Amino acid sequence: MLSRRLITGPILILILLLVVWWDDWLGPVAFGETQLAPGIALLGICMVVAALAVLELCTIAEATGRSTSPMLTIFAVEVLLIGLWGGSAETNTGVVLLVIVATWFASLWQHACGQRTKGVLNDAAATTAITLYVGGCLGFFLLLRHDVSAWWIAAVVLITKSCDIGAYFTGCSLGRHKLIPWVSPGKTVEGLIGGLALAAGVAVLASCLLASYGYKDISWPMAIVLGVLLGLAGQAGDLSMSLIKRDAEVKDCSDTIPGMGGVMDVLDSLLLAAPVAWLCFR
């Protein structure tokens, strides 16, 4: 498992860096007199990842006895992402509310058209929750792109994931006290501390590196705070997904990514880190 992760991890990082480089190189794309919002490459990768994540979550929901609509959910998530990417501060709230309300009623009426009434409340709630979980959280990366460069988006991802790496290796070597064993038996308090320390260090390194290239500069104390907050958010996101998987009695969301499980197994920590990063840079 570890050997596969050591191969898959660098490949995923390379893909991330290529997307970020492309996004930064493109900048705000213009069509005639119309200038699109920055982050069009980021939007593209978010839409692909979101679709895969929705399929996994819908499968997990099915395992818990809920009947979801994958195509409806994917459509709603993509509309939400596009709306947040191209919207403004004045319209974003309306976009989110409109998509959530539309998804809720569309799910209800999909059941009605299929002449199904049993479990309709739980099924519609699951469809709407997945839409908000994936689309709403990923959308914060697109909102963050309005305020910072694409390279800071990459930094947020790497800082968050560095906490996962630090927690894993520290926990394996020094872990003694279980963190929340009924949710994730492998996580330890010592691992969390080690992960947060590494995340803080990576945040300081990233802030210094990006500042040297003329990107948004933050002080090293703020970088430490950012690293700790992203690390905590990432671990909370990981544990949240573990809770959902325990309900469905599955270990991994799928086997899409060798050595790491499914898309949601990689994405889980980032989904909660995204809104935290957006708040930190406001």
Predicted features along the sequence, with ranges:
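Juxtamembrane boundary at the C-terminal end of a transmembrane helix
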Residues: 278-282
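Transmembrane alpha-helix interface/packing and boundary motifs in multi-pass membrane proteins
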Residues: 229-234, 255-258
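Membrane-embedded alpha-helical bundles of polytopic integral membrane proteins
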Residues: 1-229
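Interfacial loop-to-transmembrane junctions
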Residues: 246-268
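Hydrophobic alpha-helical transmembrane segments in multi-pass membrane proteins
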Residues: 195, 199-203, 234, 270-277
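Re-entrant/interfacial helical elements at transmembrane boundaries that shape
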Residues: 171-173, 243-249, 271, 275-276
